[in-house]
Amino acid sequence: MSGNGTGRRGRAVVFDYGNVLYAWEPHGALAGRRPARVWEEFVTEGGFPRWNEMADAGVPFGDILAALGRAHPDRPDWAELLADYWRHFPDTLTGPIPGVGAVVDDLLDAGVRLYALTNFNHELFAAFGRPRVPRLERFSGIVVSGRERLTKPDPAVFRVLLERHGLRGADALFVDDAPANIAAAASLGMDTHLFRGAGRLRADLTDRGLLDAPVD
C-alpha cells in the first residue's frame, strides 16, 4: 500500500461511533436515578440488549415498549425503565474516546476519506449523537442503522455503505470494537482493525501507510 498522498486518497477508513469515536455507557441514563441493581436486573433478565437492538434497527419506541409489555406483562416497571433510558439518553454519551479525535484530524489532513457506520437509532443519533462529534461534518458519508433498518453485524448494512459511496471492500479499512462486526466486514473483503485504543489504531494506520510515522 502506498504511503504517499495519491495512495491515501484512494483509501477510506470507516469508523464505528459508540466506544470508538465517542463513549457510550448505557447505565449512565439511570445513574443516580435508579439503584444499580435495578438496571443490572433489566439488562440480564429484562432483555435490554434486545430492546436496544430494535431501537437501533429503527423500530418506533412505542412499538418496542408494547413488545416489552407483551413479553413481560408482570413487569410494567421494565417498560418504565426503558422509557426513562430513552428520556435520559444524553447521559449515556459520556465523552470523546481519548486520542481518536487527533487520529481523525490527521487522516483528514492526509486526504484519507472517512466514513461512519453506526448501530444507532436514527432519531437519537440526529438529536444527540451527531452533534457531539463535530468532526463528522467532514466525513464523506455516514450510515446509521436506524435509518436503514439494518444493524451490524448483518453484512447487508455494510453493503449499503459500500454501494452507496462507490467503495470497494478492498479499499476500505473498518474500525470497530465488536469482534462480530469485524468478522462481518472481513467477510466482504474489507480490511479491519479491532479497536482497543487510539494508540494501537494510530500504529496500525501508520503501518498501513495511511499516516506518517511520528518524527523523533
Task: Please state what every model-predicted region is.
Residues 1-13, 117, 121-122, 126-216:
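Asp-based, Mg2+/Mn2+-dependent phosphohydrolase catalytic module
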Residues 2-48:
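Active-site neighborhood of HAD-like aspartate-dependent phosphohydrolases
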Residues 16-19, 58, 107, 116, ...:
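Generic structural signal for small/hydrophobic residues in well-ordered secondary structure
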Residues 25-26, 99, 197:
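Acidic donor-diphosphate engagement hotspot in glycosyltransferases and nucleotidyltransferases
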Residues 29-30, 65-69, 85-90, 124-129:
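Hydrophobic alpha-helical core bundles mediating ligand binding, dimerization, or RNAP-core interactions
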Residues 35-47, 73-85, 210-216:
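Short, surface-exposed acidic
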Residues 52-85:
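A metal-dependent, Asp-based hydrolase signature
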Residues 80, 84-115, 155:
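Short, acidic loop-to-helix structural element flanking the phosphoryl-transfer center
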